[in-house]
Amino acid sequence: MSLTRFSLCLLLTLLLAAIPVYLASPDPGVRILRSPESTVAPPGDEVVFVCETSLPPEHFEWSYASSRSRFRYLKSGNHNISITHDNDISKLRVVVSLETLGEYRCVAWFGPLAVTSTTARLELAALSGGGGDEGFKGNQAHWRVTAGNTVQWHCGHIESNPAPSWSFYYNDIELPAASTLSDSNGTLLLSNVSVASSGSYRCVATNTASGVRLALPSRLELQVSAEAMPATAPHLLDGQRVRTKVARVGESVLLLCPGVGCPSPTAIWSSPNVPGAIKNNRTRVLPYGLQINELQALDGGTYICYLDNGIRPALKHSIQLLVQQAPRIVLAPSANLTNEGEAMQLECVATGIPEPEIYWLLNGNNSANDSKANPGSNGILILQSVQKRHAGYVQCFARNSLGEDSAGTILQVNPTQIQTGDGGGGSRAYVRPQQHMFGRKQKQQTQMVPPSAPNVTRLSDESVMLRWHVMPNEGLPIKFFKVQYRMLTGTGKSWQTTNENIPYGKERNDYGAVKNFTSSVTGLRPDRRYRFRIMAVYSNNDNKESNTSGKFFLQRGATLAPLAVPSLVDIEEYSQTAVVLHWDLTSDADEDLISGYYAYYRPSASAGEYLKATIDGAKSRSFQISALEPGTIYEFKLQSFSAVAASEFSALKQGRTQRPRVSTTTEPAVHAMDTTTPSHNETFNLNPLLTGTIGGGALLVLLVVSACLCLCRRRSSRGTNQQNKPRLAELREDFVPLNTCSPNKPRTRHLHITLNPLAQQQQQQQQQQQQQQQQQHEEKDTQDNDMSYFQRPPVVYDAEALGFNGMARMSSSSLRRSQRTLERAAAAGGGAGSGTNNNNLNQPTDGSTADSPRLQASNKPGRVILKRARLSSRSENLSSGSLNSVGV
């Protein structure tokens, strides 16, 4: 027994000593594909957190931390939460309350490895004005300006989570086209004011998650004078101020330049510490501000605006633009196989604005709670003494106010070897943490990246417009989208799915860009709350839904004034796959009531649904629509919209994309024979009509040639038959009956043996008589021979009447020949009793003629005629002097 233990310990020692040192990959094969997302919701609502891994784990767990406690694992028995698992996806449903607010993250266990997702925050929707009415006394403004100026009024500051939407009222009538900013301060922008703009203005903030509305008591009394006023330099109005602007990377930001004067001033922009910020393709100078699209981190800095109307001094604004960026790990940690008890240092580098905070998790446990771990500054983790509990998955997290990012690596620990009591080598039990990870096919090709949660805006009393995007990814291609919505009023409301299949669209060359999509949902009820989500259908015919939108309150807008309808002026053929729309408004003053435009288009030959495109900005007068078919006629229509309503459709107008270009270059004729062998990739293409014409012509020529060949063969066969007729007569003459002669020449060299030797003399006399009648009957005999050969039936002679006792079969030609011979003999002999030949060949014994039916139908034995061998010609046959046939 002791020997067995010693052997096992020695074997384990050798195996551990043979383990090579591997560099851990930053992407170990098991990772979180989809982390739960932060959500803002009102009390009593239900939210769903989704977690997905690259491989199905052994089990999922969810952890939760409030603002006053550390993370702890949740149990599904709680009435406020429910947890469901489906292969590699886990879902946590939480009922929003004060007790459930906090941070959530999921943990996927792969044997001893624990992979943790990024953190999702659950926050309560709130809206407050801060300080009551007294806090807004300073916002009561009375302004008097001249016509033509641009007025910008900041309504007030409120606290709202999420950011509110703003509504402005003019003389207590809601303005449908108020231009607002996406921050906590609503801004009313009145461009090119006139006397009609005079009046009282106020604002209302609405929480987009809960639908709660807050009317701010601040007001603006505006008086626009049409009379000439003294010239004044540009100046700020009471309540106008220069402020710091905060925006995120990838967004569009508008820097305003407030101020009025007489005459109205113009703005000039510069940036001393942002090179190239003003003159680039992402920057647009507007009469009232500077718009920067697709904001980048390098765009942050100071921007200076000068308002000048020719009267000194000019008004100078300095605006500080702060660009925020979500954290991103640029250098992931990497670990080697480490011996137990040794020190180890891991490094993680991340970028982000504000600078992200970095923390570490060891198999799901915070390193701050580990006595052997020392998180240092600049993303450094120092393990003073590596322990077996550290073996597993080590993760680095970077977080700031905009989000969180993570990266991880596998840490393998080689346990310390100890000596056993019997002196043998051994080691402590050690389980390699990656044993449950490898051996499974990594889920790369089947990854389905879901779209973002939709952004909802009002389109009409019964419809809304949804906008969502798909980030660049290497997952499965998306075929189309489906929109789902659910009304939150009442109980038992289930998700409804629209009928429209929203295509993903053609692939473009900008693979690294975000793809945006737009779709409308109709058939809704006003004054109701809804939630929306997007269902993506992938190339494997599976689907995955996005996160749900926040609660959306569909406000009734029956009392709103109608918006101006844009007029399509021209449709320019831009390329084979794109056109440019040009439109106009009846009056430039209508721009103040418009936030943007919706473009609808479809092929004119189709009766299907219209495709949609969104055009931001009321001052836009042209827009390019791409991804069209070459040489195709499309029909287009436009619709203007504001934050709360949309106009009627413009008149339909048709436009065409450019036709495909056909090369007109004439290639020179090449007379030399091409001896090269074509490759397998070369193809020969013909027009289908040309191919059919060539094929039909070839078939017609083949039919004509076949008909000519058949006609020639028929004529040739007729000529051959005419030439063969004398030949047939010669063949019939080869069959010579006994005691007869040829109708043309005497057959003197034939030897006939008869029963009576004296009959030879009589036979010679008969032959001489037959020669005298030969010329008279030659023509008739020739015709009879030809006709009888082809038409007459075979004749059977009465053999007994002819003097034969036996029966022999004779050919039809020889029988007919014998019949004619008998007829000639009877005519020459002059009667039945004139002949003395004992053969009686010329007359029958019963007194019948040779042509009588009785003679032809007789069954008595007949004479036998033996066919002689055929010589080369008839003359040679007659002159050969040989015995050709013997008649018995």
From Swiss-Prot:
Residues 760-775, 872-888 have a biased composition (Low complexity). Residues 450-557, 565-660 form the Fibronectin type-III domain. GO terms for molecular function: coreceptor activity; hedgehog family protein binding; heparin binding; patched binding; protein homodimerization activity. GO terms for biological process: compound eye development; cuticle pattern formation; homophilic cell adhesion via plasma membrane adhesion molecules; homotypic cell-cell adhesion; maintenance of protein location in extracellular region; segment specification; smoothened signaling pathway; wing disc anterior/posterior pattern formation. Residues 1-24 form the signal peptide. Residues 710-888 are cytoplasmic. Residues 25-688 are extracellular. Residues 655-667, 843-859 have a biased composition (Polar residues). Glycans are attached at N80, N185, N192, N281, N336, N365, N369, N455, N516, N547, N681. The chain crosses the membrane at residues 689-709. Mediates response to the active Hedgehog (Hh) protein signal in embryos, functioning upstream or at the level of patched (ptc). The first fibronectin type-III domain mediates a specific interaction with Hh protein, in vitro. The second fibronectin type-III domain is additionally required for in vivo signaling activity. This is Interference hedgehog.
